Amino acid sequence: MALSIMSSYASFRPFKPSSSLSSSQNIIRNFDENSKYHIRSNGDLTPQKDLDKYRDVLRKADPFDEGLKMIDAIQRLGIDYIFEEEIDKIIQSQSAYKFFREFEHDHHHHQDLYDVALRFRLLRQHGLFVPADIFNKYKDNNKGCFDTRLREDIKGLLSLYEASHLCIEGENILDEAALFSAQHLEASMTRLHRYDQYQAKFVATTLQNPTHKSLSKFTAKDLFGVYPSENGYINLFQQLAKVEFNRVQSLHRMEIDKVTRWWRDIGLAKELTFARDQPVKWYIWSMACLTDPILSKQRVALTKSISFIYVIDDIFDMYSSLDELILFTQAVSSWEYSAIQKLPDSMKTCFRALDNMINESSHTIYQKRGWSPLHSLRKTWASLCEAFLVEAKWFASRHVPKAKEYLENGVVSSGVHVVLVHIFVLLDETSLTQKTLDFVENMPSIITSTASILRLWDDFGSAKDENQEGHDGSYVECYMKELGGSVEDAREEMMEKISDAWKCLNKECILRNPAFPPPFLKASLNLARLVPLMYNYDHNQRLPHLEEHIKSLL
């Protein structure tokens, strides 16, 4: 809902150059004059000395001002993996506690909302907890709500809106900030369209795709070229981002070729003609979750596991009798080849291919670590099949479970548990031990929250995959039967649950359990970020937004 703006046109302030923006322009000018950075014909980077010039700019930046704005620009452009060491040093130089105490005792004037909200967001993103109470300074004490004078500060409102998406449970002030900033940004659109089309587009894009819940992999390309952003450092780093985009694009094409050949060689597409045959779509999950180019082998391996989630889902959803599904689930629970003898050949082929994939992943870890995750991986797949079987039995008996029961099972049948356990193993970080793997295997909240987001988004439109026919349950159906509400009531409840799940996921990523290495946390977030794109069907049951992104990336 848009609010009317009471201030006059003259007093309405869009983005305007600040001292920090002027500073960024000076740095860009000096950098361009001294650098010969360019793209070679083969798309590779020029010598290391040119890349080092970017690193040098980061190292010399004031960590409390320029440094944070540079980090924001680098993250938006999707090249933060290049500067992990420099970014970590800037972030670690910050003190969340000191930041809060200094701000709390500043009684003389409001600090710039843009800077405060940016710092809040970046520190939280990197695991430094900053209390949301810092935003109390921007509230009208007499009215108990945000100061309406802030509605003229478009730059600050954008930063506040971005920061609000790192909310955790109980932070009502960030819920208020999200509503306040969104309302006034929406209200600004008409005026912005009159005299600043670029900024109007930027505001609209931010409202639709806040940074914390978006994938820079899909949005970075929109920043290429002359882009009058509130962050002038985007112009500084975009040349490097273009080079990286071309390099990584070639890498992704090579990985898709490997995945496609593997999929063809195992023969499941021929054996299971009823199942989905979409290796490129399955690869997108891996590409989104594991963004660092160095993780090429892991992306290919992860796509293999994801392909089986889709195929086995189709076996349970569309093809087999209930008796066959029970036998298949028993086979996956025991991992005894004798258990598949009474199954159709197609299901036998699927079981063997799944077992080979799991053994391959386990053997790689065994060679490196001297112990095997085989038991944990097998147990995870057994849990998935058991959840699929529960849904198959519900359908066969025409039983509609209560909404809570459906969602608890749906968290497992979403496949997120399988994906994240495989990611945890494939990353092979120093934190990977049998003890930490057991912890991840037992569905910690970082997994259940991510899985809830996927399950609810999947059910939101009750849409089928564009090439899928068959039967599935739906949270909407369960909610309406149990509580007698309308479709709109059910969907409103689902959106509230998605919001709650995001708050739980934020908490896990901000407070950081030592068992979870940063790449695993990032993969969990990225999985949740991709979900809306994967389930945003049009009236033709297609995914136009996802297809558009795939074309631009590949």
Curated annotation (Swiss-Prot):
Its function, per the record, reads: Involved in sesquiterpene olefins biosynthesis, constituants of cannabinoids and terpenoids-rich resins. Catalyzes primarily the conversion of (2E)-farnesyl diphosphate to (E)-nerolidol, and the conversion of (2E)-geranyl diphosphate to (+)linalool.
Question: What biological-process GO terms show up in the record?
Answer: diterpenoid biosynthetic process
Q: Where does this chain carry the motif DDXXD motif? A: 313-317
Please state the Enzyme Commission number of this protein.
4.2.3.-, 4.2.3.25
Binding note for cofactor: Binds 3 Mg(2+) or Mn(2+) ions per subunit.
The protein's name is (E)-nerolidol synthase TPS18VF
Annotated source species:
Cannabis sativa
Domain of life of the organism in this record? Eukaryota
Entry's Gene3D superfamilies?
A: Farnesyl Diphosphate Synthase, Terpene synthase, N-terminal domain
Residues noted as binding Mg(2+) 2 in the record, renumbered to the chain: D313, D317
Give a Pfam family name.
Terpene_synth
Q: Which GO terms describe its molecular function?
A: magnesium ion binding; terpene synthase activity
> What family, per the record?
Belongs to the terpene synthase family. Tpsb subfamily.
Q: Which CDD domains match?
A: Terpene_cyclase_plant_C1
Q: Which InterPro entries match?
A: Isoprenoid_synthase_dom_sf, Terpene_cyclase-like_1_C, Terpene_cyclase_plant_C1, Terpene_synth_N, Terpene_synth_N_sf, Terpene_synthase-like, Terpene_synthase_metal-bd, Terpenoid_cyclase/PrenylTrfase
Comment text on domains: The Asp-Asp-Xaa-Xaa-Asp/Glu (DDXXD/E) motif is important for the catalytic activity, presumably through binding to Mg(2+).
Entry keyword Oxidoreductase: no
Named cofactor requirement(s): Mg(2+); Mn(2+)
Q: Where does Mg(2+) 1 bind?
A: D313, D317
Tissue-specificity statement: Highly expressed in glandular trichomes.
The record's keywords, sorted A to Z, are: Lyase, Magnesium, Metal-binding
Q: Which reaction does it catalyse?
A: (2E,6E)-farnesyl diphosphate + H2O = (6E)-nerolidol + diphosphate; (2E)-geranyl diphosphate + H2O = (S)-linalool + diphosphate
Keyword check for NADP:
no
Binding of (2E,6E)-farnesyl diphosphate: at which residues?
Answer: R276, D313, D317, R455, D458
Query: Pathway involvement?
Result: Secondary metabolite biosynthesis; terpenoid biosynthesis
